[in-house]
């Protein structure tokens, strides 16, 4: 690392979207510091996927933060008593994890301030997505304003930018962009119910969006199913 390198902290779940974001940041010349969270999610295979993606795309450092969001509950992803739906539903789905992106971005902000990074990347999307309130442009813009009010760096004029490069892309556009940038999607796990080997259920909303993205893009889908 040198003082001339520009650094970015990137939220990396291990799924298709966040892997694409790492590749985009790398293509822009960023030294990539990736951050994942062991938050009590039922699909823990995504943590192994995140480590694989970070390694494959040359992250400078990959950090896994332990959180116990299952202690809060309220989501099918953190509470085993709530079933993951296998068909689209009206409104905000039960797979929404309360305040998840707010918590994740806050910790990424802390690491960015320590690293001297001014850019934080997140793979939220408002086109082909599940309807989560913390994936909307208004949320990203509001968090950026808060970040620059709540930090020493922000107060001293070294502002942060929250980058959401997938915000207005369709899932097929994301797939095409990632493949053009060399993302190996076989390393990724998107399924909400993935088994320990990272194989997907093929039924949940995340699996549906992923499959539709590959089909619409005309690209080969490397997803493994159980």
UniProtKB/Swiss-Prot annotation:
Cofactor: Zn(2+)
Gene3D superfamilies (UniProt xref): HUPs
Catalytic activity field: 7-carboxy-7-deazaguanine + NH4(+) + ATP = 7-cyano-7-deazaguanine + ADP + phosphate + H2O + H(+)
Residues annotated to bind ATP: 12-22
SUPFAM superfamilies membership: Adenine nucleotide alpha hydrolases-like
Chain ranges passing through the membrane: none
Cofactor binding mode and count: Binds 1 zinc ion per subunit.
Single GO biological process annotation from the record: queuosine biosynthetic process
Molecular function GO labels: ATP binding; ligase activity, forming carbon-nitrogen bonds; zinc ion binding
Pathways involved: Purine metabolism; 7-cyano-7-deazaguanine biosynthesis
Pfam family, one: QueC
EC number: 6.3.4.20
Binding site for Zn(2+): 191, 201, 204, 207
Keyword annotations: ATP-binding, Ligase, Metal-binding, Nucleotide-binding, Queuosine biosynthesis, Zinc
Matches recorded under HAMAP family: QueC
PANTHER family: 7-CYANO-7-DEAZAGUANINE SYNTHASE
Function: Catalyzes the ATP-dependent conversion of 7-carboxy-7-deazaguanine (CDG) to 7-cyano-7-deazaguanine (preQ(0)).
Family under the similarity heading: Belongs to the QueC family.
Protein name: 7-cyano-7-deazaguanine synthase
Organism: Pseudomonas syringae pv. tomato (strain ATCC BAA-871 / DC3000)
């Amino acid at each position: 690392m040198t003082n001339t390198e520009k650094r970015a902290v990137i939220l990396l779940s291990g799924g298709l979207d966040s892997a694409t974001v790492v590749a985009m940041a790398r293509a822009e010349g960023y030294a990539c510091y990736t951050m994942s969270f062991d938050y009590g999610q039922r699909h823990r295979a995504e943590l192994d996927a995140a480590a694989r993606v970070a390694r494959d795309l040359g992250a400078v450092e990959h950090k896994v933060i332990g959180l116990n969001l299952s202690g809060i509950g309220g989501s099918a992803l953190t509470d085993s008593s709530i079933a993951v739906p296998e068909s689209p539903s009206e409104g905000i789905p039960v797979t929404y994890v309360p305040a998840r992106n707010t918590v994740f971005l806050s910790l990424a902000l802390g690491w960015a301030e320590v690293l001297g990074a001014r850019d934080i990347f997140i793979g939220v999307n408002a086109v082909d997505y599940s309807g989560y309130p913390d994936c909307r442009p208004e949320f990203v813009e509001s968090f950026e304003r808060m970040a620059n009010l709540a930090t020493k760096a922000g107060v001293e004029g070294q502002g942060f930018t929250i980058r959401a490069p997938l915000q207005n892309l369709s899932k097929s556009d994301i797939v095409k962009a990632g493949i053009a940038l060399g993302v190996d999607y076989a390393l990724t796990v998107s399924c909400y119910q993935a088994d320990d080997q990272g194989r997907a259920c093929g039924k949940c909303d995340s699996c549906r969006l992923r499959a539709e993205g590959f089909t619409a893009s005309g690209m080969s889908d490397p997803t493994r199913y159980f």
